Amino acid sequence: MAENTNNSAVTETEETTAAFTTETNSGAGTGTSTIAPGYGTGRRKEAVARVRLVPGTGEWKINGRTLEEYFPSKLLQREVNSPIVLLKLEGKFDAIVLVDGGGTTGQAGAIRLGVARALNAIDRDANRAALKKAGFLTRDARVVERKKAGLHKARRAPQFSKR
């Protein structure tokens, strides 16, 4: 019984591999990037996003909710979707995202980096140059500056009185 299970698992993986092959028949190199599954991790401030892109219809699932439910702001929706729009791949991938920590802006930035890294992993030759030029593969290193002792905030000092 165990042999049959292993054989069926091998058959399924062979079919899956065949469905996502990168080989083309004619006109190789003339089309856009390959449609295959990919994974990327993005970080921004305190937020961490784990992004899976699978061939599909352009549906977003962020922590089990749609893009519009999770990010009501059109600005954040546009930011998250910008790497896909840049490469003209709208409607070709479904995004499954798990994002944790930070606020909405940090999470949107983390998802954008994760999506860009996933697209880079899918087809490095076709996608990397455009993503790099737009700055989507660069991690935004800006984080909140820590509070210092003797100050009210990171840099705000107590009011000075000459006398």
From Swiss-Prot:
Keyword Nuclease applies: no
UniProt GO molecular function: RNA binding; structural constituent of ribosome
Claim: Secreted is one of the keywords in the record: no
Residue ranges of the region described as Disordered: 1-40
Assigned GO CC terms: cytoplasm; small ribosomal subunit
Transmembrane segments: none
Pfam families documented for this protein: Ribosomal_S9
Keywords: Ribonucleoprotein, Ribosomal protein
Bias kind Low complexity: ranges: 1-25
GO biological process, one term: translation
Protein family: Belongs to the universal ribosomal protein uS9 family.
The name this protein goes by in its record: Small ribosomal subunit protein uS9
Highest classification ranks of the organism: Bacteria, Bacillati, Actinomycetota, Actinomycetes, Bifidobacteriales
